[in-house]
């Protein structure tokens, strides 16, 4: 998308998708979705460690143009790209390395919201409107507070009292 930007103001580029795909397929990342990209050229060699992730069949042809080379036809490629083909902010990923995404301070997003007030282990955090989002003017909710509640009784009480708008309840409640 031409106007897509990261929450830090950087433009989303084709290289951000390359970085993401290479990271997902890199065996050291232990990604649970790596096999979704098994039809990308050199997937098996990269997954087995015989080739570097940079040998994967993805290449940024320009700032906004991405080339994906497949080892064989994949009829559901569009579905996979729409649901699993998320970019990673390349500059932030290089800066934070394995710590990227481990806290809100080390996470850069490109959606309607950015993650704040999460330290990587806390049970609550917030999503605040991303002012750099391409369609920010149509994002009507400025902040979403998330709280993980581990006890079903507590969740039910919070919901009943109106302190939370949504919760998962067990059959007991």
Question: Residue ranges of each PLM-predicted region?
Answer:
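Aromatic- and charge-enriched surface segment that lines or borders ligand/interaction sites
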Residues: 1-33, 67, 161
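Solvent-exposed coil/turn segments that connect beta secondary-structure elements
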Residues: 3, 17, 22, 63-64, ...
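Second-shell loop/turn segments in exported
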Residues: 2-8, 54-56, 144-145
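Gly/Pro-rich hinge or "lid" segments in bacterial periplasmic/extracellular proteins
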Residues: 70-139, 143
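Ligand-site clamp/hinge motif
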Residues: 132-173
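Extracytoplasmic/secreted proteins, especially bacterial periplasmic and envelope-associated proteins
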Residues: 12, 16-23, 38, 53, ...
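Surface-exposed binding/hinge segments that line
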Residues: 16-18, 33-91
